[in-house]
Amino acid sequence: MKAERGRIMVIGKKEQRNPRQEQCAQVSMLCRQRLLGYAESFEELGKSFCEEVGIVGDDRQSILEKYMLQQSRQIMGDHLQTVARIMERVAGEELVYLPLEEKKRKSLTQAFGSEGIQARELCYVRKKSIPGGISMTLSTERSGCKASQAADMLTVLLGKRLQPSPGSPYLIEKEPHCFLFTEEPGYVALTGVSRALKEGEKISGDQYTMLESERGRLILLLSDGTGAGEDAGRGSGRVLDLMEKMLEAGFDTEASVNMLNSALYAQNEEGDHPTVDICSLDLYTGECEICKVGGVATFIKGRSGTEYIGGDSLPLGIFQKAQTERSIRTLKPGEMLVMMTDGVLDALEDDCEERMRNRIDMLEEQNPQEIAEKILSYAICSCGGRIRDDMTVFVLYLWENA
């Protein structure tokens, strides 16, 4: 497997590079070389699993068993190759350290010191596909000192609106920790959720969650378990838990969905086929990636009207490869996205997508919670107040970061 070797660059005046920076560069290069070695091993192992073997047998049962084994080998091989590609990507990322100007470094160090915070190893960080920022090691004897307070200080001192990255510690403590402060995105997303349980049930089979990535993306996840009640809720909850872990580990949306689908397909549990809807919003550009596996239509209300996307794919675990509907849209301030489970649309019965589109188009509210509640109320009223399935409405409204 051919791969471009990863690089680390430390830019600045030669005299500003201290032995610690040189050592960090050498360690990083060694780690990258090891990652590429591991990636090559995983790639070759994956290829060995994917090699096709002639299927022969004396009876129908033995042929079927060998065919199922061949499918399992193919799934395993695909996953190993996916892991190899992620290792390659991480190893190939270019990380740039740019030491702060001496005058600015002293100014920041003194300012933090006056607040009882020790700041060391200050430098600019540049990394492809991740917002640039400032990295520093912070510690304090104070209790309850939040990283957001340090971000506020940097905002005032540097004249740039900064925030702690999602991966940075929440508190500054006695023990020194590394913090990364990145520029605030140009957009702010507000969300609202409204839910209703199926009649006679105490637990919803619908589950939702949100997470923020290091790359400045807000990710919304919505899953509808098979049926309703506790078992359905357990299934959809497991889907979101695994999706969240894979996305946080660095898998992209498509790889995460395929690996999750393969796991459910391999379990071969009849009747357990949850759906998953994913909305990944770039808070710097407004680009919104919508990925749907079995979920009903997602609605986007823009300045020119309301459109609906998808709703034709099958749930997870039915086929060896997930049937994914993927769309890209760019949201602008004042526009909103509405995700929902099938219990909401099914309540509208005939021509449900068009009826829901018209209803959303008529809404004038800007509060996402109010919007979610109005949509849910409309669905419940449309079915005469009888809730025959779990209902969840998930609304995202985009604002400019003033």
Label every PLM stretch briefly.
Residues 227-249, 313, 335-385, 402:
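Active-site-proximal, acidic helix/loop segment immediately C-terminal to a metal-coordinating Asp/Glu
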Residues 130-133, 186-188, 213-219, 333-336, ...:
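Short hydrophobic/glycine-rich mini-motifs in sensory/regulatory modules
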Residues 112, 184-207, 261-267, 296-328, ...:
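PP2C/PPM family metal-dependent serine/threonine protein phosphatase catalytic domain
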Residues 99-132, 149-151, 155-176, 184, ...:
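Catalytic core of PPM/PP2C metal-dependent serine/threonine phosphatase domains
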Residues 201-215, 276, 308-349, 384-385:
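Acidic loop->beta-strand submotif enriched in PP2C/PPM serine/threonine phosphatases
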Residues 4-162, 166, 219:
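Signal-transmission coiled-coils
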Residues 224-225, 295, 340-343, 390:
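DG-centered beta-turn motif at the end of beta-strands
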Residues 157, 169-225, 231, 324-327:
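N-terminal entry segment of metal-dependent catalytic domains or homologous docking segments
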